[in-house]
């Protein structure tokens, strides 16, 4: 059920950011004030931070400041500023700055790129620590169109001032998600799909491309669980096309799924 909620959130997120793109922001947390002013002529954002009324930071951003939050990742822990940026457009791109104000300096501790998916903060395992949950959009447009692309689960934690991938800690969620991916895959297999005639033939917008993008997401989920060989066993079983070896090489070398 959890991944259904994540997918639902991503759909809502995409609609929301497009509706709010270009809006100005003026947010205050304690003695720190954040202002974001979007210039429609230059298509850029002037991002200003003031502490006790004194300007301590200003930068022109090519992205729109979608949201500014102050969050604790652990109960009673340190509070950080989360700056959610969005580039605009139907399918791209969302990113996150995790920052703090130290003295009179605005310091970006780490950043995350979420592409088309967006992200949400949620305590997935109910242990009191919030995770950053997203769909990994690394396969967007890689094998077929955006609508057919699958977004495998990605979970990060913020620890020691760094965003750390901990997707593999959520094996139950990954298995649950794999069930949906495999259901979609079996439907395509049942209907049948035409293989490319040559190993360099483009499979974009074809059924073979759809099979590739689903298999890629399955391999990614198995990779997160430390069982990537199971994903490739399924590729060998299902995708018997002339470009299979090239496809596997792309997954291993370009996407580092090995």
PLM-predicted stretches and their roles:
Residues 59-68, 112-120:
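Repeat-based blade/solenoid architectures
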Residues 85-87, 138:
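Residue-level signature of beta-propeller blades and closely related beta-rich strand-turn architectures
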Residues 43-46, 89-97, 141-154:
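Structural motif
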Residues 46-61, 97-113, 154-167:
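Surface-exposed loop/turn elements that mediate protein-protein interactions on large endomembrane-trafficking
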Residues 29, 73-82, 123-133:
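Acidic, glycine-anchored loop motifs typical of Ca2+
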Residues 26-57:
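N-terminal targeting signals for Sec/Tat export/insertion, comprising classic cleavable signal peptides
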Residues 4-14:
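Sec-dependent N-terminal signal peptides
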Residues 19-33, 37, 135-258:
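Acidic, small-residue rich beta-repeat scaffolds with periodic aromatic anchors
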């Amino acid at each position: 059920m959890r991944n259904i909620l994540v997918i639902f959130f991503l759909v809502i997120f995409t609609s929301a950011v497009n509706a709010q793109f270009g809006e100005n922001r003026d947010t205050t947390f304690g003695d720190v004030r954040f202002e974001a002013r979007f210039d429609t002529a230059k298509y850029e954002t002037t991002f200003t931070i003031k502490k006790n009324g004194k300007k301590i930071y200003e930068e022109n951003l090519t992205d729109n400041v979608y949201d500014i939050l102050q969050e604790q990742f652990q109960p009673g822990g340190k509070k950080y500023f989360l700056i959610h940026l969005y580039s605009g457009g139907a399918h791209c791109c969302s990113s996150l700055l995790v920052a703090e104000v130290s003295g009179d300096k605005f310091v970006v501790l780490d950043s995350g790129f979420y592409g088309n998916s967006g992200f949400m903060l949620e305590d997935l395992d109910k242990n009191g620590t919030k995770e950053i949950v997203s769909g990994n959009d690394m396969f967007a447009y890689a094998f077929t169109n955006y609508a057919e692309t699958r977004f495998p689960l990605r979970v990060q934690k913020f620890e020691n001032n760094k965003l750390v991938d901990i997707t593999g800690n959520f094996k139950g969620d990954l298995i649950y998600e794999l069930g949906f991916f495999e259901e979609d895959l079996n439907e395509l297999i049942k209907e049948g799909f035409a293989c490319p005639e040559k190993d360099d033939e483009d499979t974009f917008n074809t059924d073979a491309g759809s099979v590739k993008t689903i298999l890629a997401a399955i391999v990614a989920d198995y990779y997160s669980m430390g069982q990537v060989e199971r994903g490739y066993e399924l590729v060998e079983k299902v995708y018997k096309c002339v470009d299979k070896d090239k496809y596997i090489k792309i997954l291993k070398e370009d996407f580092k799924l090995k």
